[in-house]
Amino acid sequence: MLRPLGWQILLTPFYSMADQLSYVFITPAALRKGRAGGILGRLISRSGLELHTGRIFAPSAKTLGELAATLSGQAKTAAYLKGLSAGSQSLVLVLKGEDAAAKVSSIVGNDDSMNGRGETLRDTFGDLVESAEEGGKTVYFEPGVIAPASAAEAAAGLKLLASASDSEGGILDAASTFSGSTEKTLVLIKPDNFAFPNTRPGGVIDLFARTGLALVGFKPFHLSVAQGEEFYGPVLDFLVEKLPDGRAQWESIIAFMSGKRPSECTPEEKTLPGTQPCVALIYQGPNAVAKIREALGSTNPANAAHGTIRKEFGSTIMINGAHASDSVENVARETGIICLEENDFKTKIAATL
């Protein structure tokens, strides 16, 4: 039976209704080198904040300059942003919760906190090389991750990013960074990774980094029951044919992903966003579908290979860490069902600021 006792309790929202947002800007170098998962995992687990939204950006020179201007007291960071090539792909994560700006700033660090022993995210994921012979002159500076120092700076940066999110963000394209043909594939980080603030969501992304694929799409969302019915529609006939309680098993899958069983909902309730947090990722590169499926592992975690997502993070056939599309055709079908192209980044920010 695929309906484990108590999962509804474990996966109910664990965040209070806080009213402050902050953000982190994961730099192009950190994104390209597969550091985004480590950054996300530590950020969530250390802060206890909600991952409110996020988006891949390819910011223009104008946006980079204006973002730099919102960061006071971080001269190196401001100069770094202004010096980035326009269109360099980066990842913006928006965190929500009590004292979000102060918590995020403390965890990420700033220009003056990059020579410690891993106390801040910049310690671990950034690099600062200074020349002792030249009076501490900066030889190399790569922050890895950038955060505003105050709620006012966070609000200014978020408004700027929200306004640019249509034209400079979304599901981007990294084909030019690979030789030969590429394809895109979809991953869903499942709700079991969000039972409490922990490193698991970042750990999933971290393990996918070994594929060498480019992360070109990122969207936290809540699957509705109606979307779940359509998404998992193709497996209903199989379950009904193979199992005496096949339909009940199918409803359990949808309830796990959305928070409610279809038979418990009115037609109107089915269309509402679910209660269970998920994150959709788009990866791009040669043979992306096959590479992601290999890194994901067998549906049953007990049979999954060592080092795969499902071996590391799964516990049952249903609660198994992540979903990945099994064909290019299903990538198109599944991304359409969850409305991945829709930009809710700016609406979520506008609703809170």
Where in the sequence are the language-model features?
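Non-catalytic terminal and connector segments of soluble metabolic enzymes
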Residues: 13-353
